[in-house]
Amino acid sequence: MASKTYREFAASIIETLESLGLQYAIGGSFASSTYGEARTTMDIDISIVLPESEMQRLVEAIQQLGYYVFLDSIVDALIQNMPFNIIDATSGYKADIFLVAPTPLDQSVLARSRRMVYDTTTNATARLYSPEDVIIYKLKYFLMGRSQKHLRDIGAILIVQGTALDYGYIAHWAQEVGATEVWNQLLAEYRRTSSQSSPDV
């Protein structure tokens, strides 16, 4: 039997979250490849609303898939404000799960998430961050680690989405997370290289 693909691994987690009725939204490269440059990714970041009463149900459902996740790791993630992992030991695939905090940005991300097709082969859908929120979080991640991949992903989203983006929303949250300078540089570069008319920001 052929081993599962990363998309199949991700799909099994998405289907489980939906079967449990948990509110979630997917960000990271998984979402940016939908809005920007389509490419294979083995990186999925899922933000979920996980009441304490649902933690054990989630653990049991994920373990039934044959994946590793433990209640202690979820509790630690809650206390330390860090993600926990869901791991398929057979393939080595991993998903990073972020517990949604009661912050204005996290709440905005959930409210603005949208159901999108993430696999054109199967037409599978999931709730993804909006493209604007993908940009904001990639700005945050860039400031944390200075990885150029985040800037490339943002650039691809700008090129593909163009004037469909809410630039005022991005500017507001870029300021809130301390990324205004980086955002303005990316926007200026986009304007220089794009053949489209400059967005009204």
Regions found by a protein language model. Name each.
Residues 1-201:
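Compositionally biased terminal segments of proteins
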